[in-house]
Every structure is written in structure tokens, then in C-alpha cells.
Amino acid sequence: MSKATGFIKEFRDFAVKGNAIDLAVGVIIGAAFGKIVDSLVKDVVMPLVNFILGGSVDFSNKFLVLSMPDGYTGPMTYADLTKAGANVLAWGNFITIIINFVLLAFVIFWMVKAIYFARRKEEAAPEAPAAPPEDVTVLREIRDLLKDKQGS
């Protein structure tokens, strides 16, 4: 067997067997789950937080201009300044991302706790004892008949 054929066989074994497929499925499901959690944070949790705090918890437009291009007279928004080549320290965006991360981690934590709680409930439910196999049932009937014959 040539080295190339051996390499191809080894790669095929790696890709088809083992954990590669499990990993691929996990990544795909993880990406989809990430979108669900991201939507939960952006569309449900953040509006509630903004309502409770009575304003907007969005610091993304907070920034510090470190240097301005010569002769710039345009709008003083982050997007316009960076487009014009200004050196801008976007500290507000960083704070917003940290807040979103903490909220996202909190939501994931509670979702995982709920899943574990549901699993524990399933495990705690006692299973009904399995019916004995047919041969055991027949043997018990024979035993009982023999006891009855010996007793009478």
C-alpha cells in the first residue's frame, strides 16, 4: 500500500468514524443554539432590562476621539469619524459587549440548569419492574403445581 493510499484511508477513517462527525453536529447545533440565545438576550432580556432601568443600556455610541483628520467638519458619530480616518477609542461598544456577554452567560446558565432539572426528574421517576420472562413464569407455575400435589 502506498503512502498516499494509506493517508487517504487514515483520513477517511478519521472523518467518518470517531468523534469528527459528533463534533461537526455539535458545532452546527451550537451555532443554531447561539442564535436562539442571542435573540433571547436581544429581543426579550435587553428590552426588559431597559424598561426596568428606565432607559437604554446601550453604550455603543460612547467613544473618545483621540485624533481628528485635518479639516474634518462632518458629523461626530462613531461611524462617520472612523470612516473619515479619525482615531477613536470605542469604550462604549466594549462596555455594551461585556454587558451582553454577562446577560448571555446568565441566560445560558439558567437554560442548562433547567435541562439538568428536567433530566433529574426523569431519572428520579421509578420504573415499573419488568415482567419476568415467560420461562420463569412457567417454572413458577410448575413449582406451585408440584407444591399443591405434595400438600394434598
Swiss-Prot record:
Report if keyword Ion transport is assigned.
yes
Q: Name one GO cellular component term.
A: plasma membrane
Q: Which domain of life is it from?
A: Bacteria
Q: What GO molecular function annotations does the UniProt record carry, in alphabetical order?
A: mechanosensitive monoatomic ion channel activity
Q: How does it sit in the membrane?
A: Multi-pass membrane protein
Subcellular location field? Cell inner membrane
Quote the Gene3D superfamilies the UniProt record gives. Answer: Large-conductance mechanosensitive channel, MscL, domain 1
Annotated InterPro entries: MS_channel, MSC/AndL, MscL_channel
Which residues are listed as membrane-spanning?
Answer: 21-41, 44-64, 92-112
> Which terms are listed as keywords in the entry?
Cell inner membrane, Cell membrane, Ion channel, Ion transport, Membrane, Transmembrane, Transmembrane helix, Transport
What is the purpose of this protein? Channel that opens in response to stretch forces in the membrane lipid bilayer. May participate in the regulation of osmotic pressure changes within the cell.
Quote the subunit structure annotation: Homopentamer.
HAMAP family according to UniProt: MscL
The entry sums up its family as follows: Belongs to the MscL family.
Q: What is this protein called?
A: Large-conductance mechanosensitive channel
The UniProt gene name for this protein comes to mscL
